């Protein structure tokens, strides 16, 4: 059977990873204004996220505006949104399934093999959710890099990575690690001897008992 310590570690890493995914999805700092070129204006820092854009003044004032219409957003941002939401939902579902199959829980404790397989299934679901988040973060980062090095992009509209995308990346990788630990909870099949006990051995044992 699987080691309960490994299962607990995988569960903890997955839980922290899911929290990181949620926090990273909510925060607006997915990309921030890049200070490049000769004329650099540092009075205002612009942040853009999946749900809103913010402007941070040098005076310490922060103004945020939620995106009004989904249809006005580009397809890349909508795809990133969808993948992050799917990744979070699938990861939470996988964590719930894995918690049922962990050795430290009492649910279904009568069947040890089925319980371990349940934990393994939860780990696989977690890996699927983490993969969605990794693809979303990587695709968003690819678009930021492509726009940054595009010579036709105005200097004042160039962006670089913000803190939120790194939080989401870290959460997804923790989710992958935790899901892999839970998915490794594969039950070992019991080894059955291929050769039954011979009749001669049984008769010899019986004759020995008679002489005792």
From Swiss-Prot:
Region span, Disordered: 191-212
Domain of life: Eukaryota
Topology with respect to the bilayer: Multi-pass membrane protein
One Gene Ontology biological process: head development
UniProt-listed PROSITE patterns: CLAUDIN
Membrane-side (Extracellular) residue stretches: 29-81, 141-162
UniProt entry keywords in alphabetical sequence: Cell junction, Cell membrane, Membrane, Tight junction, Transmembrane, Transmembrane helix
Major place of residence: other
Segments on the Cytoplasmic side according to the record's topology features: 1-7, 103-119, 184-212
Localisation: Cell junction, Tight junction; Cell membrane
An MF annotation (GO) of this entry: structural molecule activity
TM region positions: 8-28, 82-102, 120-140, 163-183
Gene Ontology terms: cellular component: bicellular tight junction; plasma membrane
Stored InterPro entries: Claudin, Claudin_CS, PMP22/EMP/MP20/Claudin
PANTHER family given in the database record: CLAUDIN
Family note: Belongs to the claudin family.
Function: Plays a major role in tight junction-specific obliteration of the intercellular space.
Protein name as annotated: Claudin-7-A
Classification of source organism: Eukaryota, Metazoa, Chordata, Craniata, Vertebrata
């Amino acid at each position: 059977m699987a080691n309960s310590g490994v299962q607990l570690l995988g569960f903890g890493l997955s839980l922290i990873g899911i929290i990181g995914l949620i926090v990273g999805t909510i925060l607006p700092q997915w990309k921030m204004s890049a200070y490049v070129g000769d004329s650099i204006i540092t009075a205002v820092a612009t942040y853009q996220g999946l749900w809103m854009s913010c402007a941070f003044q040098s005076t310490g004032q922060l103004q945020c505006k939620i995106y009004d219409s989904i249809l006005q957003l580009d397809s890349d941002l909508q795809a990133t949104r969808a993948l992050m939401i799917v990744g979070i939902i699938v990861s939470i579902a996988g964590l719930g399934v894995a918690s049922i199959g962990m050795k430290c829980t009492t649910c279904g404790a009568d069947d040890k093999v089925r319980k371990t397989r349940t934990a393994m299934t939860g780990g696989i679901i977690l890996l699927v959710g983490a993969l969605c988040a990794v693809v979303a973060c990587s695709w968003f980062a690819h678009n930021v890099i492509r726009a940054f090095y595009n010579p036709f992009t105005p200097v004042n509209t160039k962006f670089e990575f913000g803190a939120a995308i790194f939080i989401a990346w870290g959460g997804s990788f923790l989710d992958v690690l935790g899901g892999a630990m839970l998915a490794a909870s594969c039950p070992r099949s019991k080894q059955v001897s291929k050769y039954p006990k011979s009749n001669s051995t049984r008769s010899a044992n019986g004759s020995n008992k008679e002489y005792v």
